Amino acid sequence: MEIILKYFPDLTEEQRKQFAALYDLYIDWNAKINVISRKDIENLYEHHVLHSLGIAKVIQFRPGTKVMDLGTGGGFPGIPLAILFPETKFHLVDSIGKKVRVATEVANAIGLKNVTFRHARAEEEKQLFDFVVSRAVMPLADLIKIIKKNISPKQQNAMPNGLICLKGGELEHETMPFKHKTVIHSLSENFEEEFFETKKVVYSQI
C-alpha cells in the first residue's frame, strides 16, 4: 500500500481505505478463483494496482467520462482506476464469468458506486464509451478492430477519445500501422521500480 501513497500522495481518506482493503480481498478471492498468479499475489500493489494507475499518468479523466475496461480479469485496470476517479463511470467486461464475479465482489466490498460489470465477449458489447482501457489482452490491431464500434464520437476530455492499453516490451512493430495516431508512454518515467522498466501505456486515437 505504501507504494501507492508514494506516487499518489493526495488520495482522500476514503480512497486510502479502498486501496488498503484490496490486499485482503484479493488474497481471499484468489484462493477460491485464480485471477492473479499465486506467485505474484504478494506483489499486488506494485504489479497490479500501481501498474493499473499508470494510465492516470497519461490522462486525468474528467467527471462523467465513460470508460470500458476490456478483458478486466479480476478487475485490472478498472477497479484501481475507479477508486482514483470516483466521478468517472467504468464498465468492466470479461468473457470469463468467474473472473467477473471476483471483480464484482471486490468492488462491492469496498463500496465502489461508479462501476458496472458484464460477462460477455468484447464483440457483444454495444455501448458507447469515451475510452476503452485494457491490460495486454491482445495485439493492438485486433483490439482496435473490436472496439472501434464502442468509441463515442463526442469528445469531453483534453485527449481525443480512443484506446489506452497497458503493454510491455518492444512495441514498434505492433504499433507501426497506427503510428500517426498512437503515442507510447514509458512508465519508467513515472515509477522507479525495476518492474516498470519495460512497461508502457499505449494511447491510440480512434
Curated annotation (Swiss-Prot):
Specifically methylates the N7 position of a guanine in 16S rRNA. S-adenosyl-L-methionine binds at residues 71, 76, 122-123, 135. This is Ribosomal RNA small subunit methyltransferase G. Belongs to the methyltransferase superfamily. RNA methyltransferase RsmG family. Keywords: Cytoplasm, Methyltransferase, rRNA processing, S-adenosyl-L-methionine, Transferase. It holds the Pfam family GidB. Its EC number is 2.1.1.-. InterPro entries: rRNA_ssu_MeTfrase_G, SAM-dependent_MTases_sf. One of its GO terms (cellular component) is cytosol. HAMAP family: 16SrRNA_methyltr_G (MF_00074). One of its GO terms (molecular function) is rRNA (guanine-N7-)-methyltransferase activity. PANTHER family: S-ADENOSYL-L-METHIONINE-DEPENDENT METHYLTRANSFERASES SUPERFAMILY PROTEIN. Signal peptide: none annotated. It is an enzyme of class 2 (transferase).
